[in-house]
Amino acid sequence: MKVSASSLRKGNVVDLDGKLYVVLSAQNIHPGKGTPVTQLDMRRISDGVKVSERYRTTETVERATVDDRDYTFLYEDGEGFHFMNPESYEQVTASAEMIGDAKYYLTDGCTVKLSTHEGVPIAIELPRLATFEVVDTEPTVKGQTASSSYKPAVLSNGLRTMIPPYITVGTKIVVLTEDGSYQERAKD
């Protein structure tokens, strides 16, 4: 469907010359003299190439029809990452390139939001928080609690993060999926 360039926002998917692009940032620029323009920074979905385009605010762009649905992660194999729609039990496979670093946060049965275009997954949105167990960290040294120092730790998903000194091996913690940072001790 055709939309004005000025109405595009981060996360929208556009179709330019038969190729799909995801909008990374959209900025409306109003110069003192001349026509206002919209600056779009986009990434081509097929190969990950970043492009930057300028459109007059009156120009139209073809917005791709994208289906956003909740899917349950099943497993990973040589073909890619397999997800199932919990309503229709339909399964889709996403490539490792499309999943990227999100693979560290995928656990059996976790629910994610997949964006699909004509049945092919093009983007993934993880839950904001995830819980993992600390499998390796340095022992706490007495007297270190006065300062707010953090120590390195390895989680059960293989991710490295910084945790407070009172957390020990075997403790479950909650991390932010955007950057893998420690949020709190799990409440279970």
Curated annotation (Swiss-Prot):
SUPFAM superfamilies assigned: Nucleic acid-binding proteins, Translation proteins SH3-like domain
Location in the cell: Cytoplasm
Annotated SMART domains: EFP, Elong-fact-P_C
Pathway: Protein biosynthesis; polypeptide chain elongation
Keywords, in A-Z order: Cytoplasm, Elongation factor, Protein biosynthesis
Gene Ontology biological process terms, A to Z: peptide biosynthetic process
InterPro entries, sorted: Elong-fact-P_C (IPR015365), NA-bd_OB-fold (IPR012340), Rib_uL2_dom2 (IPR014722), Transl_elong_fac_P/YeiP (IPR020599), Transl_elong_KOW-like (IPR013185), Transl_elong_P/YeiP_cen (IPR001059), Transl_elongation_fac_P (IPR011768), Translation_prot_SH3-like_sf (IPR008991)
GO-annotated cellular components: cytoplasm
PANTHER family for this protein: ELONGATION FACTOR P, TRANSLATION ELONGATION FACTOR KOW-LIKE DOMAIN-CONTAINING PROTEIN
Similarity-based family: Belongs to the elongation factor P family.
HAMAP family: EF_P
Function description: Involved in peptide bond synthesis. Stimulates efficient translation and peptide-bond synthesis on native or reconstituted 70S ribosomes in vitro. Probably functions indirectly by altering the affinity of the ribosome for aminoacyl-tRNA, thus increasing their reactivity as acceptors for peptidyl transferase.
Name of the protein in question: Elongation factor P
Species for this entry: Phenylobacterium zucineum (strain HLK1)
